[in-house]
From Swiss-Prot:
Cofactor binding, note field: Binds 1 Fe(2+) ion per subunit.
Gene: GA2OX2
Free-text tissue specificity from the UniProt record: Preferentially expressed in flowers, siliques, and upper stems. Expressed in cotyledons, at the base of the shoot apical meristem and developing leaf primordia.
EC number(s) recorded for this UniProt protein: 1.14.11.13
Similarity section: Belongs to the iron/ascorbate-dependent oxidoreductase family. GA2OX subfamily.
Protein name as catalogued: Gibberellin 2-beta-dioxygenase 2
Active site: R274
Reaction catalysis annotation: gibberellin A1 + 2-oxoglutarate + O2 = gibberellin A8 + succinate + CO2
Organism encoding this protein: Arabidopsis thaliana
Length: 341
C-alpha cells in the first residue's frame, strides 16, 4: 500500500468535526458489480441505478498504471508542507481546500484538490496548481481524465440503450460537449484518532452529487458508505482496481425519479489514510435539465420543473451539504423528504 511520506496536520483553526458511530458491512445489501464486457451489462447497470443509484464496475478499460500514478502524485501533493499547499487555495471552488467543505459551514476530516476537468474552461486556481507541481502531475491528471471520461460515456450510452433513449448519445454528449462543466476531485482523509465512546470523525458528510454521474476510485482504505432504501447505511468495501459509479441529481431528474441519486458519506479510518479521486460529469452551464420526453412524454407526469444546470449549480452552492437540493425543483415539493429516504 502507498502511504504518505510524512504525517499530515490539518487546519487547527477548525476543531469541531462531526462524528458518527461506525456501521457494519451489511452483507444483505451486496453492492452491485457490473462487468462492462458482459453482454448483459446495460441491463445490470439500469437495475443497479434503480435499486441503489450506485454500483461497481470491473473490466472498465482504464490502465492500472494511470490509476496508480495519479494516486502517487496526489500523495506527493498532500505530503507537501502546509504553507505550499495553501498557495493553491482557498478553493473558489477550484483549488486546495482543508476541512472546510463549501461556503456554508460544513466541515470534515479532509483535505482536497478540486480541478476543472475541461481544458477549454481552465480556471486560475487549476492553472496555479499545475504551476506549483511537477509536470508529471499535470500529465497524470490529463491522461487519467481521458480514460475515465470514456468510462462515463460508455456507462451513459449503455443506460440510453437499455432505456430506449434516442439518440444513443443523448446523455453522454452532455459530458463530451466542449463546454461540459465537469471536474476532478482528489481527496485525502488522514488517519484520525478514534473519539470517545468509539465515535469516528466524519471525513465528508452525507450528501448526493448534483451532476449527472460520478466515477470514483480510491486506495484500499475503507470509509465510503451509502444510504440504501430502508435508510440504513452500508459500508462499501474498497477496491483500488475498480470504479464506483454514483447516479447524480441531474440524472435522477432526467429519468423522472426512476434512478435515484445516492446519498453517501465518508468516515475517517482510524488506522490508515484514504486517497480517492472522483470525476464528476456535469453538463454545460446552459444545458436544460428536465425529464426526458422519450421517457415521460406528458409534462403533466413530470415530477420536476425544467431548469438549467447553471440554476441548479447556483442553488446547490447556497445550500448545506446534506440538504435535499432537488426539493426546490419538484413540481409538488415533498413535505417531509426524510420519511422517504
Amino acid at each position: 500500500m502507498v502511504v504518505l511520506p510524512q504525517p499530515v496536520t490539518l487546519d487547527n483553526h477548525i476543531s469541531l468535526i462531526p462524528t458518527y458511530k461506525p456501521v457494519p458491512v451489511l452483507t444483505s445489501h451486496s453492492i452491485p458489480v457490473v462487468n462492462l464486457a458482459d453482454p448483459e451489462a446495460k441491463t445490470r447497470i439500469v437495475k443497479a441505478c434503480e435499486e441503489f443509484g450506485f454500483f461497481k464496475v470491473v473490466n472498465h478499460g482504464v490502465r492500472p498504471e494511470l490509476m496508480t500514478r495519479l494516486e502517487q502524485e496526489a500523495i506527493g501533493f498532500f505530503g507537501l508542507p502546509q504553507s505550499l499547499k495553501n498557495r493553491a487555495g482557498p478553493p473558489e471552488p477550484y483549488g486546495y481546500g482543508n476541512k472546510r467543505i463549501g461556503p456554508n459551514g460544513d466541515v470534515g476530516w479532509i483535505e482536497y484538490l478540486l480541478l476543472n476537468a475541461n481544458p477549454q474552461l481552465s480556471s486560475p486556481k487549476t492553472s496555479a496548481v499545475f504551476r506549483q507541481t511537477p509536470q508529471i502531475f499535470r500529465e497524470s491528471v490529463e491522461e487519467y481524465m481521458k480514460e475515465i471520461k470514456e468510462v462515463s460515456y460508455k456507462v451513459l450510452e449503455m443506460v440510453a440503450e437499455e432505456l430506449g433513449i434516442e439518440p444513443r448519445d443523448t446523455l453522454s454528449k452532455m459530458l463530451r460537449d466542449e463546454k461540459s462543466d465537469s471536474c476532478l476531485r482528489l481527496n485525502h482523509y488522514p488517519a484520525a484518532e478514534e473519539e470517545a465512546e468509539k465515535m469516528v470523525k466524519v471525513g465528508f458528510g452525507e450528501h448526493t452529487d448534483p451532476q449527472i454521474i460520478s466515477v470514483l476510485r480510491s486506495n484500499n482504505t475503507a470509509g465510503l458508505q451509502i444510504c440504501v432504501k430502508d435508510g440504513s447505511w452500508v459500508a462499501v468495501p474498497p477496491d483500488h482496481s475498480s470504479f464506483f459509479i454514483n447516479v447524480g441529481d441531474a440524472l435522477q431528474v432526467m429519468t423522472n425519479g426512476r434512478f435515484k441519486s445516492v446519498k453517501h458519506r465518508v468516515l475517517a479510518d482510524t488506522r490508515r489514510s484514504r486517497i480517492s479521486m472522483i470525476y464528476f460529469g456535469g453538463p454545460p452551464l446552459s444545458q436544460k435539465i428536465a425529464p426526458l420526453p422519450c421517457l415521460v412524454p406528458e409534462q403533466d407526469d413530470w415530477l420536476y420543473k425544467e431548469f438549467t444546470w447553471s440554476q441548479y449549480k447556483s442553488s446547490a452552492y447556497k445550500s448545506k451539504l446534506g440538504d435535499y437540493r432537488l426539493g426546490l425543483f419538484e413540481k409538488q415539493p415533498l413535505l417531509n423528504h426524510k420519511t422517504l429516504v
